[in-house]
């Protein structure tokens, strides 16, 4: 299950405090998440997706969001948990295939040092 960033303030916190990584298709912001009162880190990651109206009409923007969501979902078990991710689609993304989007996302996550080649399973503490 993918947990989503939904509120505007959640996106704003990641933009202001997080680190950014970019390539031709995507911009990625990451921030280690802290949700509990005692400041423990969550055992899961959350993702938010932003696609500007400059990218295309609503059909194109929805396709971009679906491609990003599916790429994240299929790679979720290889990503280090406990981070908030915000992905921003750039204009060239609208004409790319799923495999190109997945390759771009994976390269950004590897650049951030959050990608493991081995599958990570959630183990309770």
From Swiss-Prot:
<keyword id="KW-0540">Nuclease</keyword>
<dbReference type="InterPro" id="IPR000100">
    <property type="entry name" value="RNase_P"/>
</dbReference>
<comment type="similarity">
    <text>Belongs to the RnpA family.</text>
</comment>
<dbReference type="GO" id="GO:0004526">
    <property type="term" value="F:ribonuclease P activity"/>
</dbReference>
<keyword id="KW-0694">RNA-binding</keyword>
<protein>
    <recommendedName>
        <fullName>Ribonuclease P protein component</fullName>
        <ecNumber>3.1.26.5</ecNumber>
    </recommendedName>
</protein>
<keyword id="KW-0378">Hydrolase</keyword>
<keyword id="KW-0255">Endonuclease</keyword>
<comment type="subunit">
    <text>Consists of a catalytic RNA component (M1 or rnpB) and a protein subunit.</text>
</comment>
<dbReference type="InterPro" id="IPR014721">
    <property type="entry name" value="Ribsml_uS5_D2-typ_fold_subgr"/>
</dbReference>
<dbReference type="InterPro" id="IPR020568">
    <property type="entry name" value="Ribosomal_Su5_D2-typ_SF"/>
</dbReference>
<dbReference type="GO" id="GO:0001682">
    <property type="term" value="P:tRNA 5'-leader removal"/>
</dbReference>
<comment type="function">
    <text>RNaseP catalyzes the removal of the 5'-leader sequence from pre-tRNA to produce the mature 5'-terminus. It can also cleave other RNA substrates such as 4.5S RNA. The protein component plays an auxiliary but essential role in vivo by binding to the 5'-leader sequence and broadening the substrate specificity of the ribozyme.</text>
</comment>
<dbReference type="GO" id="GO:0042781">
    <property type="term" value="F:3'-tRNA processing endoribonuclease activity"/>
</dbReference>
<dbReference type="GO" id="GO:0030677">
    <property type="term" value="C:ribonuclease P complex"/>
</dbReference>
<dbReference type="Pfam" id="PF00825">
    <property type="entry name" value="Ribonuclease_P"/>
</dbReference>
<keyword id="KW-0819">tRNA processing</keyword>
<dbReference type="GO" id="GO:0000049">
    <property type="term" value="F:tRNA binding"/>
</dbReference>
């Amino acid at each position: 299950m993918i947990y989503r960033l939904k509120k505007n303030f959640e996106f704003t916190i990641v933009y202001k405090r997080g680190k950014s990584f970019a390539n031709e298709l995507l911009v990625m912001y990451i921030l280690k998440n802290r949700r509990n009162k005692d400041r423990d880190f969550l055992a899961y990651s959350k993702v938010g997706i932003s696609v500007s109206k400059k990218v295309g009409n609503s059909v194109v923007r929805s396709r971009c969001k679906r491609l990003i969501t599916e790429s994240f979902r299929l790679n979720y078990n290889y990503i280090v948990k406990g981070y908030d991710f915000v992905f921003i689609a750039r204009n060239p993304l609208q004409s790319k295939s799923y495999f190109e989007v997945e390759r771009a996302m994976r390269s950004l996550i590897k650049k951030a040092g959050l990608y493991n080649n081995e599958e990570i399973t959630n183990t309770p503490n």
